[in-house]
Design a protein with these regions (language model features):
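Flavin-dependent oxidoreductase catalytic cores
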Residues: 1-204
Length: 204
């Protein structure tokens, strides 16, 4: 394994198996641990299930117990959409850490919020303004890397996530899914009653 020739940590992420009838997570995790993996992340759904079923956190608890004696940390993943979800996963599974996936789309603040909840028992949710501003930062950086047209196409779905929970967001998201230029995104916020935010001296 890479650990034999590199000082960099190597982590492995697995699902519970290909189908419910053929779970393979125990064998996969054991092989990873024996090969020198520094940590194993488990998403307790089968490949065939996709996101159709709820994540089986019981598998996370089982894997954590199995690898505890081997000194290999276990990261849990699946159905973690809020700081409260993350805390509950840690408490109920004994996992060493939580890996966010879809829960972080449109809400990069979830990492800070979760840390605050775990450290203090409370957290300050990010405002709608902060989330939209973060969305524009991501859009602009993506445009710098991939070009404006490609970035705007890619950000349509992401921006819908950023605007989730915003008053009037349903109508706003219709405008966002048709955006082809950064100016279209700004115009969507100008034309929608959902938000009136200032970004870089301009009104969205």
């Amino acid at each position: 394994m890479v650990t034999a020739v590199s000082p960099l940590p190597v982590t492995v992420k697995i699902r519970s198996g290909w189908t419910a009838e053929s779970p393979s997570w125990k064998e996969a995790a054991r092989a990873a641990a024996e090969a020198g993996a520094n940590a194993v992340t488990i998403h307790p759904r089968t490949r065939a299930a996709g996101y159709g079923d709820s994540a089986d956190w019981g598998i996370i608890a089982e894997l954590t117990a199995c690898l505890k004696g081997k000194g290999v940390p276990v990261f849990g993943s699946g159905d973690v959409f809020s700081p409260e979800d993350a805390r509950r996963m840690l408490e109920t599974t004994g996992a060493d850490a939580v890996m966010f996936a879809r829960g972080a789309l449109g809400n990069p603040f979830i990492f800070r919020e979760t840390r605050e909840l775990l450290e203090t028992g409370a957290y300050a949710p990010a405002s709608s303004e902060a989330r939209i501003e973060a969305g524009f930062r991501e859009l602009e950086r993506l445009a710098a890397d991939e070009g404006e047209e490609a970035a705007c196409r890619k950000m349509r779905k992401r921006f819908c996530a950023y605007s989730k929970g915003v008053a009037g967001g349903a109508e706003l998201r219709k405008l966002l899914t048709a955006a082809e230029r950064i100016a279209d995104y700004r115009r969507a916020f100008q034309d929608s009653a959902a938000a009136c935010l200032t970004h870089g001296g301009h009104i969205f």
